[in-house]
């Protein structure tokens, strides 16, 4: 059934990710392992090659790698426990057949019904099968931190990727510098630990740099990783407001209200405006046991005395008399009380 005018394009959101019935325990252990790996490699770095450089007067290396380690560790731990933009679950009172439409820059979006969260999802909001939640501006589910990346923690995710790139590069440069300075010395424990730290740092550096580049391109186009993977906006992206405005909205604009702290309106004060269209319920469906009859004259049921069709009988006649307009007659003694006009056929 057409709901809007033909001039407005109605867009349907991409198909949801398949439900994955996995336990939270393995993913949580993997996220904890990543934090432990960061602490372990950093401990080896600061305890062996960096210590030797400091003892020989090279203070520039710990002055650079120290703050980068603190920033990386803080962003990694914070991202594990951050709120990606979880929306409140609905109730069973909401009708899933009701059609809700919003318009964004002359592009109409039909709000899809989430059968798990029991509400109509706003634009760019998707249900994560791993976390079993609906996330506003869903980007992707990061298994490294066992958390979704969405509207409220995307900046923290970008900070983590950037700090990991810089920290991995600083570790690699420092370890190579240490190996070059000690090339004339025999093999020692410090050299072994430097090689042990430099190999994983070099292995993580290239993938992290590519990930940072991909995320930067996505922010420039105002397109999330999930939308880019599904080719959600192949021709025209209504959320694209230009290079500078896209970066401002993604990294510096106010985040708006936290939907997990209190029930608030889904309209954000900053960002792309949503215009709520008129809500129209879905057309009624014919029950399965009621089938239309064959074409042509239909059989009429026999009338039983005292059981006529609706709108007939004595009660209907009384209602008809009550609906008749009342007239006010004037008399020399004053106005008389209103009387109903007699129906046709009455004496």
Curated annotation (Swiss-Prot):
Catalytic activity: L-cysteinyl-[protein] + hexadecanoyl-CoA = S-hexadecanoyl-L-cysteinyl-[protein] + CoA
Ranges for domain DHHC: 112-162
Topology versus the membrane: Multi-pass membrane protein
GO molecular function, a single term: protein-cysteine S-palmitoyltransferase activity
Family matches, as Pfam families: DHHC
EC top class, as a word: transferase
EC code: 2.3.1.225
Function: Palmitoyltransferase that mediates palmitoylation oproteins, such as RRAS and SQSTM1. Catalyzes palmitoylation of RRAS, leading to increased cell viability. Acts as a positive regulator of autophagy by mediating palmitoylation of SQSTM1, promoting affinity between SQSTM1 and ATG8 proteins and recruitment of ubiquitinated cargo proteins to autophagosomes.
Membership in a protein family: Belongs to the DHHC palmitoyltransferase family.
Active-site positions on this chain: 142
Keywords: Acyltransferase, Cytoplasm, Golgi apparatus, Lipoprotein, Membrane, Palmitate, Transferase, Transmembrane, Transmembrane helix
Region (Disordered) residue spans: 275-347
GO biological process: peptidyl-L-cysteine S-palmitoylation; positive regulation of aggrephagy
Membrane-crossing segments per the record: 29-49, 59-79, 156-176, 194-214
InterPro entries given in the database record: Palmitoyltrfase_DHHC (IPR001594), PFA4/ZDH16/20/ERF2-like (IPR039859)
One GO location term (cellular component): perinuclear region of cytoplasm
Subcellular location(s) per record: Golgi apparatus membrane; Cytoplasm, Perinuclear region
UniProt name for this protein: Palmitoyltransferase ZDHHC19
Notes on the domains: The DHHC domain is required for palmitoyltransferase activity.
